Amino acid sequence: MIHLPILRHGVPYTSLDVVTVLHHRTREPFVEVSQANGGLIRRDLLPERQEAAREALARIPFDRLIAMCTEAADHFLNATLPLGDADQSPDDYVLQLSATTGMPHALVRRNVQRVAGVMREMRTVLRGLTRGLDLSVLDTGHGEHAGHAISFYPRTQALGVVLPSNSPGVHSLWVPAIALKMPLVLKPGSAEPWTPFRIAQAFMKAGCPPEAFSYYPADHAGAGEVLRRTGRSMFFGDVSAVGGWEGDPRVELHGPGYTKILIGDDLLEDSRWEAHVDLMAASIADNGGRSCVNASGIWVAASHAERVADAVAARLATILPRAATDERATLAPFADPRVAERISAQIDSGLQTPGAREMTLHHRGTPRLAAFEGCTYLQPTLVLCDGPDHPLANREFLFPYAAVVPVTPEAMARMPEPMGKTLVVTALTRDQRLSDRLLRSSFVDRLNIGAIPTNQISWDQPHEGNLFEHLYARRSFQQTADPISAAAAGA
């Protein structure tokens, strides 16, 4: 059986404590993963050890780190890399990730390209996050930008990342840390330990110092140690998981997105909204509907809510379970069928509350909960709610789910506040007043105006926070031409 070790500052370590991850379909043991306990994590993350790892990265010029990112992207895509005592080819990686998560091969490969694209375009990504700052300033600690002296200092000695299992694409968010001279402390998702391990191996093959990578498969207590022992971190999880860290400036939270599509009243004329049905369906269902940037709500004037819901439901109903090897597969099964059953039961319970109808069932003709080739799926589900207060109007689940919510004229005039806090809003409108309100609002983290799917991400822009600003702070800085001579003259 495959065994995945811990990485203790780049050094593989096999623990006596292991967890066996099962194949999502056969339920047979597939991989053993060494587990890091809290004591081991605390010892490895003593301040002096974190500082030594950061010094190893800090010595490498920024331009060389950018070159390493490009080389690592190629290795991640194409190389056979170490995997414990064995090796892992690119095809092995796709098969293994699919085996434990259920993600279809086509979706795995698409996410791999997304991660590699960020690594390959690292200079452009960082230029966007820093508003064009020349990051060679990190080599010396100070420099000049637009005629002004600048100096930045690290807020931490390492970036801790507590990761999910829902999609490999999420790893695009933390890989820029290496180019920013920041070591990584990674706690992988329980069903998806593959991608962070492979990325670390790709960087090490490209010449990155091994001590810059710590990899700690662990339980919830171990995840807490990673968050507490690193001065800055990212935490991916659901509301119940991330809620305890809300308000802690050290921890950048990545929870549910409650992403929405807003259809302006101007698009209702002559049924112009119909041209965007495929965009709405793709926003809901792409990548298996498992990302925080997938739409979970479509908000539209009450006069057109049922027509919009019916059209989008008809499109979603064509998405069916397929074999993992089928290039047309877009739905991922649930590794644990009980999770799918619980989610489906929650939706059925919500439908018992008056004011909601499941629109996809009529078009599909089969239940939401489905079995196919020994796997359990939740088929895409669209619910039409009578108003925003219905229990299903603002929910997010781990499959393609969305609610169509009717908007009164009074609520449309106050948009986006009636929708609440939203990670992404795609506004299908040419109404400048509506666009202006969206631009001024603090309720929207990512704003698309026009026919842009909610899941179309530009990685050179912030996503639930700005990684550079999370890791570095600017200080005031002045220096004479010859500090030593100036000090002597003053004496």
Predicted regions and their residues:
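Conserved C-terminal structural/oligomerization subdomain of aldehyde/semialdehyde dehydrogenase
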Residues: 23-36, 62-77, 188, 205-210, ...
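Alpha-helix/helix-capping structural signal
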Residues: 2, 303, 432-433
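Residue-level signal for inorganic ion chemistry
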Residues: 27, 65, 181, 213, ...
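ALDH superfamily catalytic-core signature
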Residues: 71, 202-208, 230-232, 238-387, ...
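Catalytic cores of nucleotide-enabled group-transfer and carboxylate-activating enzymes in metabolic
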Residues: 41, 67, 103, 247-248, ...
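Rossmann-like NAD(P) dinucleotide-binding subdomain of oxidoreductase/dehydrogenase enzymes
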Residues: 131-275
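Short, conserved secondary-structure transition motifs
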Residues: 217-227, 333-342, 459
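N-terminal Rossmann-like NAD(P)+-binding subdomain of aldehyde/semialdehyde dehydrogenases
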Residues: 1-148, 318
